[in-house]
Amino acid sequence: MLMPQNPQIYVDADACPVKPEILKVAERHGLEVTFVANSGLRPSRDPMVKNVIVSAGFDAADDWIAERAAENDIVITADVPLAGRCVAKGALVTGPTGRVFDPSNIGMATAMRDLGAHLRETGESKGYNAAFSPRDRSAFLETLDRFCRRVKK
C-alpha cells in the first residue's frame, strides 16, 4: 500500500511578492516549499525549501507545477490557467492577494481573465492591475495559514 505523500507548497515564484511570508508560514507548520521560476531564485540553506529553475519556455514553470501538484497540496499563483489545472487535481490554490481559487469559482475566474485579455487586445482596456497592498498581504497570510492547517489534518 502506498503511503500518501506529505503536503507540499508549490509557488509560481516569478514576480511573487509574498516569498518571505510563504517561508515563515511554511516553517511554522513544518511544510516543504518548492519555488519554481524561469530565472534566478535566492538560495536557501533550509532543507524544507527547494528552488527549481525551469527553461525559459512559455508556461514552463506552470507545467512543472501542474504536473506535480496533487490533492492536499497548496499552490500559490496569480496565473488563472495554472490555478485551474491545480484545482482540477484537488490542490488548494490561492493567489498572492489571498484570492482563493476552487471548483466553485475557477470557471468565472477563467472567463473574467479571458474577457480581460480580449478587452486589452481590442484596446477597450489598458489592463492596469492595482498595486499590491498591505491588505493583500494580510489576506494572503490568513488564507495560507488556513490552508496549512487544513492539509495537516
Swiss-Prot record:
It comes from the Bacteria. Pfam families: DUF188. CDD domains: PIN_YqxD-like. Transmembrane segments: none annotated. NCBIfam families: PRK00124.1 (NF001095). HAMAP family: UPF0178 (MF_00489). Belongs to the UPF0178 family. This is UPF0178 protein Atu1478.
